[in-house]
Amino acid sequence: MLALERSLLRGFLSAAESQEWKQGEISATESGSVLQLIFDGKYEAIFSNSTIRNVFSASSVAEEDIESYLEKQILMYLDCSTEVDNMERQRLMFLLGVGSLQLFVQSNWTGPPVHLQLQGFLPSALLQKCLEPKMLHATILKMLVLDAESVYTLTSHPILLLIARVVLVNSRHKLSSLQTLPWWTLRCVNIHQQLLEERSPELFTLAQMCIRQMTEAEALFAGDEGWHLAVQFNLECAYTFLYYYEYKKAKQCFCTAKDIAKLQINLTGALGKRTRFQEKYVAQLILDVQRSEEFIPPHSELTPAPTPLENLTMNCDLNDDTVLNEIKLADADQYQVPDLCAEELAVILGICIDFQKNNPIHKLTEEELLAFTSCLLSQPKFWAIQTSALLLRTKLEKGSTRRMERAMKQTQALADQFEDVNTSVSERMKIFYCCQVPPHWAIQRQLASLLFELGCTSSALQIYEELEMWEDAVICYERAGQHGKAEEILRRELEKKETPVLYCLLGDVLKDHQCYDKAWELSRHRSARAQRSKGLLHLRNREFRECVECFERSVQINPMQLGVWFSLGCAYIALEGYEGAAKAFQRCVTLEPDNAEAWNNLSTAYIRLKQKIKAFRTLQEALKCNYEHWQIWENYLLTSTDVGEFSEAIKAYHRLMDLREKYKDTQVLAILVRAVVDGMADRTGEAASGLKGKLRELLGRVTSRVTNDGEIWRLYARLYGNGHSDSSEDIEKSLQCLTKAHKCEIQSNDWEKDVSSFKEVAKGAIEIAHVAIKCSKKKSNNQEALQILSSARLNLRGLSSKAKQRFVDVGSHEICNEVTDEVTTMDNLIAELQELSNQLRDQG
């Protein structure tokens, strides 16, 4: 049976397997006929099978809900006496679960639409409890609610997922003979999660257990025959981890899949043209894909055969009068991508999605992702990969004026393909679970979003209302300034049926706590959304204590709400509850390790808690996520300086100057200069004096941008020894810096009037004179030495005469006592400088 289970996971039988299957015993059984229907993509026909109909039929229906009834009937069928019969029954129920899941995927993801009547296989007595179809639909949806997270209301044929869940989740303890059951349970979990408003901790726990169980099933992946499934399993695990914020585990799985596939995937540059009128070839970013060690995927018959091009979604041309449809390379043969199989293409798509999740939104990132999509679209072979690549490209192109029209057309084509009956579901299901194709309503939602951005508000609203995506419709109305209309449609829907979500949306529109309280009561105190929305309103009104209470209740119900943890942390900081803030932001970065702002805020909490080393480390993580955020760099600069990471502080200062041309922090520079000059120990115990060269380079850059700050010039002079160095170059540099500092200080008019300010200026001039004397003595050229002495003398003479004019006692006509010492020192230095000048002239 393991061989057939492998084939079922792949979705098809190879020619050899098909021959073997026809000759085997299982093909003649009930489970064999159902398995054949699944291979043929005739999932609806499963529900016409007499045995399966008998499982669902009962002479009497007790007072129970549909889920309980289904579970009871399936377990009754499985609880039989003979071992041989039991194996067959396990197989049949397992295939019922798989077939139901596949049909549910067809009904909501791939198309074409499914026309299944519940009356055909469920007893009428069970269905009569719900008087009308809408009521029955709502009842089934309610059974799929997990962790109080609502299910998308227009989910098509939810009974199919319910059956799949009853078999693959609730009854899995009775299906012990099926080795691949955990993998199908994982697929069921991933599909179920995509219907829910938020991530479900219950589903994630189940997914982790399934992954663990399948990882231990070594026989399934052994040898060349297991190669295809090993790649697929790692990709499916990666997408699961990615969705639940487990980015490191996701990356490991993507890398494992790439290593098994023996692919080398690198972004590189190649000469090419992008526009029709471009004359010269210039460097273009492309994806270079090669197989390592001339590897050829084993057993080509075990990989899906490519779908005919006419059955794939059309790749719309750009039709621009300037930009080419694709890059025209100067040497296309040099970067020829090998003919890739389904698993290899899925690996490239996975690496692309991982790259997207782990890099900040930036123009360069967009170009890199477009290189991935171009590579994938150059080999159109599989519906799921083509759809995923085209969807990603439309998201990347919607911001470009030259590409917006194609993005619009392409999204429309992707939305329309669901109704297309020309491509069989078997073709669409190839490699489906390795690609994370969104459900068809998510594609329509993307189309509506594009329409709204283009200004087609009424068309966007029409789609949102047809999809019953009331939150998007409300946002649309609010942005269009039609607040009354937003309230009107919500009240209209509430008249039809009161739900916690609708009351939450009404609360958002009216900014009314009563609406959230009503939602909370309706949900029987299980709606994380109600408490989240109520908390956000308190936050907006700066009612931080009440806001914290609401957010705490919300994350207690569903701890996988990234945004709520972040807002909770902000509220705690406002209340100066730094321990609570640290805990909240720690949960944020655990859920999303590349959330730069959360890392930054976590460091703020640690600083307030006097845990500076932790703050330093968290800021390092923040910068890995966002290298362009100047406020994070500033926090990093201050924290690095504070903890003695002087080398990092210098690096941070340079980066801040990259981001903000005239950035200045004199206090930090003063600490760094003192650390280097005094040889202070850094955090590792090393003397900071070793950073003298790097700090001189930094101050050189700072003074080239900020030329009018005397204090910075003085720090620069101090770094060169303030004239006390043995090096003539250092003494001269000190003199230059001190002179520039002095010029900055005398640019202000106030220093001449105020005694203390004058004394500071005089002190600076005296220091310049002393350094000038030292510098002149180091000069071999007498003319240069004379110039230095003359400049210092003239400066002192000007200050001395100013003092004698401004700071004179009216009665005695003598200089004020407060400046007597400075004037005497200056006069003595003037005489000394004159004497030295005379000596130099005599030597000349």
Swiss-Prot record:
SMART domains: TPR
UniProtKB keywords: Repeat, TPR repeat
UniProt cross-references to Pfam families, sorted A to Z: TPR_16
PROSITE patterns in the cross-refs: TPR (PS50005), TPR_REGION (PS50293)
Transmembrane segments: none
Stretches forming TPR repeats: 454-487, 493-526, 528-561, 562-595, 597-629, 630-663
Keyword Transmembrane found: no
Name of the protein: Tetratricopeptide repeat protein 27
Species, as recorded: Gallus gallus (Chicken)
